[in-house]
Amino acid sequence: MSVTIDHTTENAAPAQAPVSDRAWALFRALDGKGLVPDGYVEGWKKTFEEDFSPRRGAELVARAWTDPEFRQLLLTDGTAAVAQYGYLGPQGEYIVAVEDTPTLKNVIVCSLCSCTAWPILGLPPTWYKSFEYRARVVREPRKVLSEMGTEIASDIEIRVYDTTAETRYMVLPQRPAGTEGWSQEQLQEIVTKDCLIGVAIPQVPTV
């Protein structure tokens, strides 16, 4: 009788449990040793799901559109402007706002990982974390934006800002025509996370 040995799996890495299972096992081990304070996990869950939100960034943009003094502060010292609202925190210690103009479109990327200004943009979208976006937007931003549904005219410069270990960026988009007389609350509704990253432009709803 002959025996065939499959050598293809000899050096294969052992199968791993899903990340969620491993995380839960780690939590139970730490909790069993009394190393997890009461409410600690729930507190962070609330922070990530409710507090870290692009609604905060939209609030900053809406005020900048309607308050020239705040706009100037946001552009010269974004950290101080955000601190007025108490929106600082992890991944938001040093914030820089970059302004779109009729001749300039700004876009944010983190080419090394997926950092964003969590306190005012929320957690990064899946596409933002993808290698394809991180690799391509720095080389061909106009094409990438077009593929995402945002057409930028050829005579408009596109400037890409790469997040660093210290600096987190947000885009201050241009205020759309047709929003004259809108309240800050109304303006906030048209500013999305994609607008704050720079891959989309605020749109006025059509009736």
Curated annotation (Swiss-Prot):
Acyltransferase is among the record's keywords: no
Regulation of its function: Inactivated by nitrosylation of the iron center in the dark and activated by photo-induced nitric oxide (NO) release. Inactivated by oxidation of Cys-115 to a sulfenic acid.
Membership in a protein family: Belongs to the nitrile hydratase subunit alpha family.
Cofactor dependency: Fe(3+)
Entry's EC annotation: 4.2.1.84
Pfam families reported in the protein's UniProt record: NHase_alpha
Positions bound to Fe(3+): 110, 113-115
Assembly notes: Heterodimer of an alpha and a beta chain.
Note on how the cofactor is bound: Binds 1 Fe(3+) ion per subunit.
The protein's name in its UniProt record: Nitrile hydratase subunit alpha
Residues annotated with Cysteine sulfenic acid (-SOH) modification: 115
NCBIfam families for this protein: nitrile_alph (TIGR01323)
Lineage: superkingdom: Bacteria
SUPFAM superfamilies linked: Nitrile hydratase alpha chain
Reactions catalysed: an aliphatic primary amide = an aliphatic nitrile + H2O
GO molecular function, one term: transition metal ion binding
Name of the top EC class for this enzyme: lyase
Keywords: Iron, Lyase, Metal-binding, Oxidation
Residues with the Cysteine sulfinic acid (-SO2H) modification: 113
Entry-linked InterPro entries: CN_Hdrase_a/SCN_Hdrase_g_sf, CN_Hdrtase_a/SCN_Hdrlase_g, CN_Hdrtase_asu/SCN_Hdrlase_gsu, Nitrile_hydratase_asu
Encoding gene (name): nthA
Function: NHase catalyzes the hydration of various nitrile compounds to the corresponding amides. Industrial production of acrylamide is now being developed using some of the enzymes of this class.
Post-translational modification: Oxidation on Cys-113 is essential for the activity.
